[in-house]
């Protein structure tokens, strides 16, 4: 790095830290000179549709409204933790085929990876027939997936221009007499997908294999069993789906982040990936939840995050700590592969109630920026439209605040990650090449100060898109002062920016995207 460039980035960091204008001796930073850090996947920002949404079943229950009686805990379920009764509620299958609003909202997020998985996918039975499905799941399974439901998934992914990512059934029903994974269900699902004109782009064998029986795996499932199953999985892929990428291991709840009961016998990623025969993956994956929601507080009394800490640096920085932990494992066990976060959200167990508000949008965008700089290739938000952490409200099918931040990210942030300097103070800055504009640069500026505006000076003319809300707990947001809303058909309004040049005053508690189409950054050509 040249001395001049160090001074330039230092000036930008100082502006971010102080939020005040520096003297004339300090020139504005030039986005055209931001250096390339790394490249991410062109479909970096992705999302999950839980298998339980597709088939219907018991998913995370809504929080009681004021005045409603809270359900009493009942033992059983998640590793014997006494929270089962308050955790789940029956939900009907999502309408991926006929819900025009949902399809239009998803399409606005751009072509991207769509992952259909989750713990419920581990024990789903694919009824590969046009005859009526069984009234109850076959032995060893917990739910039934019909051809019509899967056809809806494939059609949805086609409609939004996505790449389909899945995991396969691995419960007792999907195993032979000796307990080894049987690829028959995977083979059938893949064949039917191809028959429909679809394609499974990538697959994890198991959703969260380190969680064992908590996620539907046989009791006593260990690293040796995982290695054995992964060998069968690779043989299946090579023979039946040679273009499909193997993703894994897909672990969660490590690096000091407690999101599962301590008594379930978690199998560390180190053990999973070092067992013989050594599991081989094309893409290394993990899940990141910085904590658990109130639904699962009984798992660990020290877990959870209060809403007044939502904008704190130590909360946001957990993403870096987790990424560092898993990048070390990637280098050790799958060097040279891309790394994906195949699930992430505000908190595990459906998210806290405030995950649905403006308050969590800061984490959403900050995490995308941090993990891109860390070299994570794809980040799958959990979920598109289920529970409190969803981008879209499952009851109204209307966008939540983070959805609008996601749309602007999809439209503006390209796949070349740039160095906008180190975050300092309450203003966090992340930059990537401007999508679809050779030489252009996009910058997102997150003002975490809830009381004071921040100042930012960058050279060149830009178009600015500033998101704000009336308060942190708002369920709606404004773009450059105008409230954002969609029609009943889910078609988005025209998201118009405003001209920006020179020193910019960024409102308190705001997220601003700035597009510099004429930056002439050589890394972006």
Predicted regions and their residues:
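Bacterial N-terminal signal peptides that target proteins for export
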Residues: 1-11
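Bacterial N-terminal signal peptides
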Residues: 10-19
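Non-catalytic accessory regions flanking glycosidase/transglycosidase catalytic cores in CAZymes
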Residues: 22-260, 266-280, 324-327, 331-342, ...
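Active-site His/acidic residue clusters
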Residues: 217, 289-314
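Aromatic-lined glycan-binding groove of carbohydrate-active enzymes
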Residues: 281-290, 295, 371
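Amphipathic, small/basic residue-rich leader segments at the start of a protein or domain
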Residues: 283, 314-315
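Active-site and adjacent substrate-binding regions of carbohydrate-active enzymes
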Residues: 318-319
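Ligand-binding pocket segment of bilobal, Venus flytrap-like solute-binding proteins
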Residues: 357
């Amino acid at each position: 790095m040249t001395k001049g460039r160090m001074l330039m980035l230092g000036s930008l960091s100082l502006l971010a830290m102080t939020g005040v204008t520096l003297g004339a001796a300090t020139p504005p930073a030039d986005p055209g000179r931001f250096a390339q850090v790394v490249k991410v996947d062109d479909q970096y920002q992705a999302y999950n549709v839980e298998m339980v949404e597709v088939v219907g079943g018991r998913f995370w229950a809504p929080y009681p409204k004021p005045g409603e009686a809270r359900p009493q805990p009942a033992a059983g379920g998640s590793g014997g933790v006494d929270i089962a009764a308050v955790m789940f509620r029956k939900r009907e299958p999502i309408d991926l085929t006929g819900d025009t609003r949902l399809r239009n909202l998803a399409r606005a997020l751009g072509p991207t990876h769509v992952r259909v998985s989750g713990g419920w996918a581990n024990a789903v039975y694919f009824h590969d027939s046009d005859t009526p499905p069984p009234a109850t799941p076959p032995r060893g399974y917990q739910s039934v997936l019909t051809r019509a439901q899967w056809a809806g998934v494939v059609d949805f992914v086609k409609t939004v221009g996505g790449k389909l990512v899945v995991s396969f059934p691995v419960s007792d029903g999907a195993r032979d007499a000796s307990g080894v994974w049987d690829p028959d269900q995977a083979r059938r699902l893949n064949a039917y997908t191809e028959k429909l004109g679809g394609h499974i782009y990538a697959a994890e064998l198991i959703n969260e294999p380190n969680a064992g029986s908590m996620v539907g795996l046989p009791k006593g499932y260990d690293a040796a069993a995982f290695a054995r199953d992964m060998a069968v999985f690779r043989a299946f892929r090579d023979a039946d789906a040679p273009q499909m990428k193997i993703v894994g291991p897909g672990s969660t709840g490590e690096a000091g982040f407690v999101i599962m009961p301590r008594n379930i016998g978690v199998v560390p990623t180190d053990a999973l990936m070092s067992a013989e025969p050594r599991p081989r993956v094309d893409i290394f994956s993990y899940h990141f939840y910085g904590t658990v929601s109130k639904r699962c507080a009984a798992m660990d009394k020290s877990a959870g995050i209060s809403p007044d800490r939502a904008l704190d640096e130590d909360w946001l920085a957990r993403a870096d700590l987790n990424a560092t932990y898993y990048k070390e494992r990637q280098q050790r066990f799958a060097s040279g592969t891309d790394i994906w976060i195949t699930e992430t959200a505000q908190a595990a167990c459906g998210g806290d109630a405030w995950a649905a508000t403006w308050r969590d949008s800061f984490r959403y965008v900050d995490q995308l920026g941090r993990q891109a700089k860390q070299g994570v290739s794809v980040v799958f938000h959990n979920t598109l439209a289920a529970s409190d952490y969803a981008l879209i409200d499952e009851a109204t099918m209307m966008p939540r605040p983070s959805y609008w931040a996601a749309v602007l990210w999809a439209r503006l942030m390209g796949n070349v990650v740039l160095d906008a300097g180190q975050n300092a103070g309450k203003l966090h800055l992340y930059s990537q090449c401007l999508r679809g504009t050779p030489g252009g640069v996009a910058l997102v500026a997150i003002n975490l100060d809830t009381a004071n505006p921040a100042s930012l000076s960058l050279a060149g003319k830009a178009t600015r898109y500033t998101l704000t809300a009336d308060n942190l707990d708002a369920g709606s947001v404004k773009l450059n002062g105008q409230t954002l809303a969609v029609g009943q058909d889910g078609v988005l309004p025209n998201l118009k920016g405003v001209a920006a040049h020179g020193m910019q005053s960024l409102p308190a508690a705001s997220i601003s995207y700035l597009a510099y189409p004429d930056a002439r950054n050589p890394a972006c050509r």
